[in-house]
């Protein structure tokens, strides 16, 4: 609703017309110069208001819209439940005030009606005054600008905030008076009622406001606000006589100024501008100099520090100190927040928490994450404000003799907060908690605190770390990980107990001693075994044209169940008839612990670094030789049965190359053309027997399924792993070790295949948990 009242303000022109004076607005450094006929002074409060920088709102966080009072009022009412706003207003007409003195000069070419004192001061300056003279005689007396024109006006409005949820409810009225033209004790207020009251506001203001306030008190459904802006009112002209009311600073008014140099003679204008700039910028303490896009004050001898505004610098340094305090307050409030304290209470105290463990609890707490984001947002605002002040501070200190003194705040990283939690947990036994050092598991206490360290639980982890802390004292280790044993409060690598009760694998024979005994074929290292062959007999001559099979077996399961046997050498005494051209060839197969012939491995004679047969003559007349292959400590191996396959080849001399060549003999159908006969006198195995207790090993295996304690199961697994590795070390040469341990379980302990597989799986799983586990691939030998 607009109501123009321009016709009622036609009397304004006569009031403004007498202002034929030289006016200057009272901004900082400016004064008001008028003639003696109409002198007035701008109040000080207006001068300070106008001194605000016009672009200061750009440095705020949200801009002018969010700073507007109307927006703030609306947001406040909206939070209170008022969701609808009705506003009725009228805008006063605009009046433009012009400087008539300047109009007379421009349009009528009349001289300016300057005060006699002003004219005298201009003449006293002469034609070449210095800047100090201009400042003292003109600027300090009359200012730097004067009023050219101004636009004045105002607005009056009524705003009603409405909560529609409460509006339709019936209200009890006291005294039987109705709210709007009715009678009765109960009345419902509608939007139509509010519309009627708002329409009558500019007709009968007092009565309308009284009724609206009654509705506001009775229902709580509305909120009434009056607003008046601008210096003028349609019903009041009294305040037009004061300059303060005309020049009031409000968003509805516009004031246009002009430099005072336009009123001066030509020869004074340039000096006046220079003096005005120096006066405003340098505060009369120096002369403004601009060069290469930079301006500064050339200080006078009286004011050597005119370029260094100490008050402004000190104010900015104080602002930085306040920001630093606010920064610390933000961090302290975060530490004291419910989310942070709730995390501290949820952390377990039965084990030590390193930074990684705390980070996992931190990451799972969504409420703490949200609170930490709020902290980051607040610190980000402070950080931007700090940088803005620092840039301005360095600009001010650019030509100062001292550097600015400040300290930039530093954002605390996540690792800091994780360490802070450790400090509160383990270093909080004093008034002020200390700082926890994770590497040394100790606390650094404040200088005035003798001790701040509390009990630090044991550290859990893999390898030598604890598996559990002691229930009665969390600072001590209660149990260890697999492969470690608790000793004097520390977890040390567990070593398997001696295997002598299960299998004696130690021997005192050194390499030189063993070689001497084998050369002598000492009976003390002979393993007595049973000779079996269907093709021949010991000490009898036979025709070697066909392959002969013979074996030496021990039948340990039947005769020697408490022993296993190790072979160090194999020796045969072979005799040939005189002038025989046959050469014996042996293929050796070794069965380690029994079973079928297919579970034997072939001995790679003279392959790689494996030894070859050694032949020594025994009886020249009978042409007998001892054929011996020595394994020694390097190639010794378990054996239960040795299979020897004997065949022959023909030895001949190549005349062309003077070399011995061999070829297979042809089948002789005529006995008269026989190439010779062969005889085996002895077949011996040299080695030693080891004590072996299959029942003890079975009991050890039973502990895998029925352990007395967890420690007994781990000890049994360690012993079985040690036994497996020691047995497999005697595997024959090859790219892959043969799994002799499975053969031992299968044939000497009579375990089923599935039992053997289960045991091997348990050993592999346990071995993978041990420190520095050694895994190796094995080849299958026994089915």
UniProtKB/Swiss-Prot annotation:
Pfam families: BRINP, EGF_BRNP1-3, MACPF. GO terms for biological process: cellular response to retinoic acid; negative regulation of mitotic cell cycle; nervous system development; positive regulation of neuron differentiation. Belongs to the BRINP family. Residues 1-33 form the signal peptide. Residues 85-281 form the MACPF domain. It comes from the Eukaryota. Keywords: Cell cycle, Glycoprotein, Growth arrest, Secreted, Signal. This is BMP/retinoic acid-inducible neural-specific protein 2. GO terms for cellular component: cytoplasm; dendrite; extracellular region; neuronal cell body. Inhibits neuronal cell proliferation by negative regulation of the cell cycle transition. Glycans are attached at residues 185, 354, 473, 579, 626, 658. It is found in: Secreted. InterPro entries: BRINP (IPR033237), MACPF (IPR020864). Its main location: secreted.
């Amino acid at each position: 609703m607009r109501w123009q009242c321009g016709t009622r303000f036609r009397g304004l022109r006569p009031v403004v017309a007498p202002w034929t004076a030289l006016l200057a607005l009272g901004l900082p450094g400016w004064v008001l110069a008028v003639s003696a006929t109409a002198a007035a002074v701008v109040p000080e409060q207006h001068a300070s208001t106008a001194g605000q920088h016009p672009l200061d709102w750009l440095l705020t966080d949200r801009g002018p819209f969010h700073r507007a009072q109307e927006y703030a009022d609306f947001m406040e009412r909206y939070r209170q439940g008022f969701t609808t706003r009705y506003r009725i207003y009228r805008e006063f007409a605009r009046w433009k005030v012009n400087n008539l003195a300047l109009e007379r000069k421009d349009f009528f070419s009349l001289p300016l009606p300057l005060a006699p004192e002003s004219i005298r001061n201009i003449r006293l300056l002469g034609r070449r005054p210095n800047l100090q003279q201009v400042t003292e005689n003109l600027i300090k007396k009359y200012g730097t600008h004067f009023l050219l024109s101004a636009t004045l006006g105002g607005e009056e409005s009524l705003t009603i905030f409405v909560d529609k949820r409460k509006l339709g409810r019936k209200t009890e009225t006291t005294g039987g008076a109705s709210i709007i033209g009715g009678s009765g004790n109960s009345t419902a207020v509608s939007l139509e009622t509010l519309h009627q009251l708002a329409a009558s506001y500019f007709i009968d203001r007092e009565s309308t406001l009284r009724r609206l306030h009654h509705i506001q008190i009775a229902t709580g459904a509305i909120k009434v606000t009056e607003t008046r802006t601008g210096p003028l009112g349609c019903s009041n002209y009294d305040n037009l006589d004061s300059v303060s009311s005309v020049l009031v600073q409000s968003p509805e008014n516009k004031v246009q100024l002009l430099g005072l140099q336009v009123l001066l003679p030509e020869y004074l204008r340039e000096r006046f501008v220079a003096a005005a700039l120096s006066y405003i910028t340098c505060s009369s303490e120096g002369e403004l100099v601009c060069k290469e896009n930079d301006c500064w004050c050339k200080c006078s001898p009286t004011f050597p520090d005119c370029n260094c505004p100490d008050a402004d610098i000190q104010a900015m340094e104080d602002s930085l100190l306040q920001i630093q305090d606010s920064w610390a307050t933000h961090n302290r409030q975060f530490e004291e927040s419910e989310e942070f304290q709730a995390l501290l209470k949820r952390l377990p105290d039965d084990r030590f928490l390193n930074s990684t463990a705390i980070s996992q609890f931190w990451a799972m707490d969504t409420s703490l994450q949200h609170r930490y984001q709020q902290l980051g947002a607040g610190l980000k605002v402070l950080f931007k404000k700090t940088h803005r002040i620092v840039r301005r501070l360095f600009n001010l200190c650019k030509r100062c003799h001292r550097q600015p003194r400040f300290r930039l705040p530093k954002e605390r990283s996540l690792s800091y907060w994780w360490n802070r939690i450790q400090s509160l947990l383990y270093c909080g036994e004093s008034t002020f908690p200390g700082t926890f050092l994770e590497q040394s598991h100790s606390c650094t206490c404040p200088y005035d605190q003798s001790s701040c360290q509390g009990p630090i639980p044991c550290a859990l982890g893999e390898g030598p770390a604890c598996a559990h802390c002691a229930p009665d004292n969390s600072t001590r280790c209660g149990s260890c990980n697999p492969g470690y044993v608790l000793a004097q409060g520390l977890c040390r690598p567990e070593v398997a107990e001696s295997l002598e009760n299960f299998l004696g694998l130690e021997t005192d024979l050194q390499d030189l001693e063993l070689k001497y005994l084998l050369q002598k074929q000492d009976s003390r290292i002979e393993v007595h075994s049973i000779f079996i062959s269907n093709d021949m007999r010991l000490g009898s001559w036979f025709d070697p044209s066909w392959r002969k099979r013979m074996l030496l077996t021990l039948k340990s399961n039947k005769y020697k169940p408490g022993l296993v046997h190790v072979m160090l050498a194999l020796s045969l005494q072979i005799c040939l008839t005189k002038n025989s051209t046959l050469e014996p060839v042996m293929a050796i197969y070794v069965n380690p612990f029994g079973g079928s012939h297919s579970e034997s491995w072939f001995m790679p004679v003279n392959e790689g670094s494996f030894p070859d047969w050694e032949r020594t003559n025994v009886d020249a007349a009978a042409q007998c030789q001892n054929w011996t292959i020595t394994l020694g400590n390097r190639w010794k191996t378990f054996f239960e049965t040795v299979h020897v396959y004997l065949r022959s080849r023909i030895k001949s001399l190549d005349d062309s190359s003077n070399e011995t060549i061999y070829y297979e003999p042809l089948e002789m159908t005529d006995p008269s053309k026989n190439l010779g006969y062969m005889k085996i006198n002895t077949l011996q195995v040299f080695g030693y027997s080891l004590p072996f207790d299959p029942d003890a090993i079975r009991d050890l295996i039973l502990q895998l399924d029925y352990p007395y304690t967890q420690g007994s199961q781990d000890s049994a697994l360690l012993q079985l792993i040690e036994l497996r590795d020691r047995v497999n070390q005697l595997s024959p040469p090859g790219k892959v070790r043969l799994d002799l341990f499975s053969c031992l379980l299968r044939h000497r302990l009579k375990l089923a295949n599935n039992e053997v597989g289960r045991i091997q799986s348990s050993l592999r799983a346990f071995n993978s948990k041990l420190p520095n586990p050694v895994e190796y691939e094995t080849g299958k030998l026994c089915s």
